[in-house]
């Protein structure tokens, strides 16, 4: 169960870090936005290593679904933009795919 906590915290810090770069480079904010960006992205990487998984690629693939959920949440809450129907459909498809990766049977180690 702690995996979900690590995934959601990692997503929060990854999105926050990328958003800080977005604010600096796309919105013309101060270069000081780079400081929280780098701190957030470092925390993202560290948190993702706490996930209990045998293979990094499988952990990252499962994380992708949670990242998309968090991104649509960020869009709605932080940027105050109402997600479109296509956003919700894409989110659902990605969560289904990530669930197959996360909960699917393991027939081999490869």
From Swiss-Prot:
InterPro entries to which the protein is assigned, alphabetical: UPF0060
Membrane-spanning regions, if any? 5-25, 31-51, 59-79, 84-104
Task: Tell me the Pfam families matching this sequence.
Answer: UPF0060 (PF02694)
Compartment(s) of residence: Cell inner membrane
Domain of life, per lineage:
Bacteria
List UniProt keywords, sorted A-Z.
Cell inner membrane, Cell membrane, Membrane, Transmembrane, Transmembrane helix
**Keyword flag Zinc-finger:** no
Q: Principal localization? A: membrane
Topology relative to the lipid bilayer, per the entry, is: Multi-pass membrane protein
Similarity comment: Belongs to the UPF0060 family.
Q: Entry's PANTHER family?
A: UPF0060 MEMBRANE PROTEIN YNFA
Q: What is this protein called?
A: UPF0060 membrane protein PFL_4337
* Species per Swiss-Prot/TrEMBL record: Pseudomonas fluorescens (strain ATCC BAA-477 / NRRL B-23932 / Pf-5)
* Organism ancestry: Bacteria, Pseudomonadati, Pseudomonadota, Gammaproteobacteria, Pseudomonadales
């Amino acid at each position: 169960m702690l995996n979900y906590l690590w995934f959601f915290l990692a997503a929060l810090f990854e999105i926050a870090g990328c958003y800080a770069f977005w604010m600096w480079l796309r919105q013309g904010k101060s270069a000081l936005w780079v400081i929280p960006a780098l701190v957030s992205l470092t925390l993202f990487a560290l948190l993702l290593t706490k996930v209990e998984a045998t293979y990094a690629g499988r952990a990252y693939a499962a994380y992708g679904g949670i990242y998309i959920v968090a991104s649509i949440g960020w869009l709605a809450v932080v940027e105050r933009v109402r997600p479109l129907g296509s956003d919700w459909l894409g989110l659902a498809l990605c969560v289904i795919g990530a669930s197959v990766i996360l909960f699917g049977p393991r027939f081999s180690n490869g």
